[in-house]
From Swiss-Prot:
Binding site for [3Fe-4S] cluster: C9, C17, C50
Residues making up the signal peptide according to the UniProt record: none
Function per UniProt: Ferredoxins are iron-sulfur proteins that transfer electrons in a wide variety of metabolic reactions.
The protein's name in its UniProt record: Ferredoxin 1
Organism: Pseudomonas putida
UniProt: [4Fe-4S] cluster binding residues: C21, C40, C43, C46
Keywords from the UniProt entry: 3Fe-4S, 4Fe-4S, Electron transport, Iron, Iron-sulfur, Metal-binding, Repeat, Transport
Pfam families: DUF3470, Fer4
Requisite cofactors: [4Fe-4S] cluster; [3Fe-4S] cluster
């Protein structure tokens, strides 16, 4: 089991979750974070820290967002590891809660 970052992180990229991760399993893209499924220890510390409520246990990923399970695994292999909190993206508050942001994902 692992945790998964989903759609609402895109264009927000709050990094509160990164700070609490005991195994540093977050990876950072231009406008999105992902969790490496082979490194996550399922501790659940990150989930309540996400202001965008974009992190879910793999077995609780909302319907229609199952593609994020594979996407997290794929992008964690190519993006750099992030271990410290950074400022959210400038328009994070504007984008928080907007549906269908997968088209805005920058690889």
């Amino acid at each position: 089991m692992t945790f998964v970052v989903t759609d609402n992180c895109i264009k927000c990229k709050y990094t509160d979750c990164v700070e609490v991760c005991p195994v540093d399993c977050f990876y950072e893209g231009p406008n999105f974070l992902v969790i490496h499924p082979d490194e996550c220890i399922d501790c659940a510390l990150c989930e309540p820290e996400c202001p965008a409520q974009a992190i879910f246990s793999e077995d609780e990923v909302p319907s229609g967002m199952e593609n994020f399970i594979e996407l997290n695994a794929e992008l964690a292999e190519i993006w750099p590891n992030i271990t410290e909190r950074k400022d959210a993206l400038p328009d994070a508050e504007e984008w928080d809660g907007k549906p269908g942001k997968i088209a805005d994902l920058e690889r």
